UniProtKB/Swiss-Prot annotation:
Name assigned to this protein: UDP-N-acetylglucosamine--dolichyl-phosphate N-acetylglucosaminephosphotransferase
Reactions mediated catalytically: a di-trans,poly-cis-dolichyl phosphate + UDP-N-acetyl-alpha-D-glucosamine = an N-acetyl-alpha-D-glucosaminyl-diphospho-di-trans,poly-cis-dolichol + UMP
Residues that coordinate or bind dolichyl phosphate: 154, 208-216
Source organism of this protein record: Schizosaccharomyces pombe (strain 972 / ATCC 24843)
BP GO terms, sorted: dolichol-linked oligosaccharide biosynthetic process
Protein EC: 2.7.8.15
Lineage: Eukaryota, Fungi, Dikarya, Ascomycota, Taphrinomycotina
Gene designation per UniProt: gpt2
Any single Gene Ontology cellular-component annotation: membrane
Length: 446
């Protein structure tokens, strides 16, 4: 009874915020995000059996009893997100669609004409291009879950999905310059450097990196949704710095748009994490990783903080750099690099890449790579005591890196460690952006 009343209260709060009397789009978006959380949490257990019947299912490899549970539940989160963002369109532009309620417009018969002339077509274009790019990458995720597309075939596809966004950015904003640090300006004799089309290549690279980087930190209950939730919260905090203390109109508008896109992501991710947390009752699938990563790339580009975004993605950058030897064939890469369950202790331990005993000797590139990474304490290598030949090494992932340094741990504790690391780097990024960067960059280029 108490739980039912609590749930009704959450639904009522979301609806009240959505239809707030002040017609504040931000408050309405907060309410919509609350409803997105409840809708995601409601739909997932109801559609799970249907997903299993259609073949969208899998077994949790890190459990003693490997039950079949529904997979690709990220598609439910993405669908709820898109429904919410479509519903939000008339809310965002309410004062232009219903001009009689806009106090800033004249009260005579010309109110409709004035409202039409003031309608922010550029904001609508940016909003719709963002949804189109996110939808395109979400479809890529669904296809990947269906057909298990190879990395070399899908790696660059998010850049194609970002084309609508980049075109709108080119037409409406066109900002391609970067600020030069004040200590370097006397030598370069300029405060700005115009990168031209190189800046668009950089933004395309951001669109490629964000979805893929979420996707390769995986294999543990809750880690994909958990890292995405922390990242989205940090991005929202970054936006609030500008919204609560606006320095200029352009910065306020850019970060409000970012908030409109990222708050519903927080809602649907929290709803998904409720069922993906250890012991997981659903798998998120590649769909969620691509969807969530693209939302973050989009808000970074439209919010003009794509460089700051990379500070928040430090764990993902570290994981990608650590994974390079296996991704590019310097060291053998197994099909799955997730940690292994010790059945006796119930704890997760490092997974290893085994080196074939029939291969004499190991390639020089492999020996050099594992030697360097071992000296940097990034991996553990086990050797044959009689010959000194490497027998196996831990897989090159941040999850195995954490297990290597902190030792075996329970699955949910490992996810908490990854989320904690994500939060610490997010706070570090906020400190760098809002307290250190102003000392180096006198002007804020939003």
């Amino acid at each position: 009874m108490i739980e039912s009343c609590f749930n009704v209260g959450i639904w009522a709060t979301g609806l009240a915020l959505l239809m707030n009397q002040g017609q504040s789009p931000l408050l309405s978006n907060v309410g919509l995000s609350v409803l997105a959380y409840k809708a995601t949490a409601m739909f997932i257990p109801r559609v799970g059996p249907s997903f299993i019947k259609r073949g969208f299912s899998g077994k949790d490899m890190n459990k003693v009893e490997k039950y079949v549970i529904p997979e690709t539940m990220g598609a439910v989160s993405a669908l709820v997100y898109f429904m919410c963002m479509i519903i939000f369109i008339p809310v965002l532009f309410y004062k232009y669609l219903v001009p009689n309620h806009n106090p800033n417009l004249p009260s005579d018969g010309s109110v409709a004409e004035v409202a039409k002339s003031q309608f922010p077509h550029d904001l609508l274009g940016a909003y719709l291009s963002a949804l189109l790019s996110i939808l395109s990458v979400s479809l890529l995720g669904i296809l990947d879950d269906l057909f298990d597309i190879r990395w070399r075939h899908k790696f660059f596809l998010p850049a194609i999905a970002a084309i609508p966004l980049l075109v709108v950015y080119y037409v409406d904003y066109g900002v391609t310059y970067v600020s030069v640090p004040s200590i370097v300006r006397p030598f370069l004799k300029r405060s700005l450097i115009n990168l031209g089309f190189l800046y668009y290549f950089y933004m395309a690279a951001v669109a490629i990196f964000c979805p893929n980087s979420i996707n390769i930190i995986a294999g543990v209950n809750g880690v994909e949704a958990g890292q995405s939730l922390v990242l989205a919260l940090v991005i929202a905090c970054n936006d609030l710095f500008y919204v609560l203390s606006p320095k200029n109109k352009d910065a306020l508008r850019a970060h409000l748009l970012s908030l409109y896109l990222v708050l519903p992501l927080i809602g649907v991710t929290a709803g998904l994490l409720k069922y993906n947390w250890w012991p997981s009752r659903v798998f998120v699938g590649d769909t969620f990783c691509y969807f969530a990563g693209m939302v973050m790339a989009v808000v970074g580009i439209l919010g003009h903080f794509s460089k700051t975004l990379m500070l928040f993605f430090i764990p993902q950058i570290f994981n990608f750099a650590l994974s390079v030897p296996q991704l590019f064939g310097l060291v053998e890469c197994p099909r799955h690099r997730l940690p292994k369950l010790n059945v006796k202790t119930g704890l997760l331990e490092n997974s290893y890449t085994e080196f074939s005993l029939n291969e004499h000797p190991l390639p020089k590139k492999t020996l050099l790579t594992i030697s360097i990474f071992e000296k940097l304490r990034l991996i553990r290598v086990e050797y044959d005591p009689s010959t000194g030949r490497p027998l196996r090494c831990t897989n090159f992932t941040i999850i195995n890196f954490v297990l290597y340094h902190l030792g075996p741990m329970r699955e949910d504790h490992l996810t908490i460690c990854i989320m904690g690391l994500q939060l610490l780097t997010g706070i570090f990024g906020l400190i760098i952006r809002h307290f250190v960067a102003p000392l180096v960059y006198p002007e804020d280029n939003i």
